[in-house]
Amino acid sequence: LRIPAESEKIIRILESMDKPASDSALIAALVTTAHQQLTYADNQPAGSVLTALALGQGECTDFADLFTTLARAAGLPARTVFGIAYSNGDQPSFMFHAWNEVLANGQWQGVDPTWNQVRLDATHIKLSDDLGAALLFASYTKEVRLKVLEQSYF
């Protein structure tokens, strides 16, 4: 993943934002900004952050990579993570998804700029880096869906 944090386009986006007083407010503003910069395009392969910005659209990995880039350019450690999350789309199901973790106040906080979530909902299930990478590759060659076969409650 190439993070163009020094890109003129990224710097312009950050300069156009109000300057939040705390890391928590900055994270919320960055989630909203990343969400507003792109329109979701379901079947578009993930590309570079700058390509997604130029097109004005992207899929979840593009939203997540844009957030990672903006956060790092603003001085916050951030990373893109992969897993599964429940989508209420045309065919509600758990699907492959990308979102972010950002370090604030000594703790990693999950955020989802695709769905404009400053706090992740309970359906985000992070996968290991190896499994996440394998699912990312598989999602480009075929549709990846998970089906709940059984559920139980405490």
Give the label of every model feature segment:
Residues 6-8, 15, 59, 101, ...:
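Glutamate identity and glutamate-enriched acidic tracts
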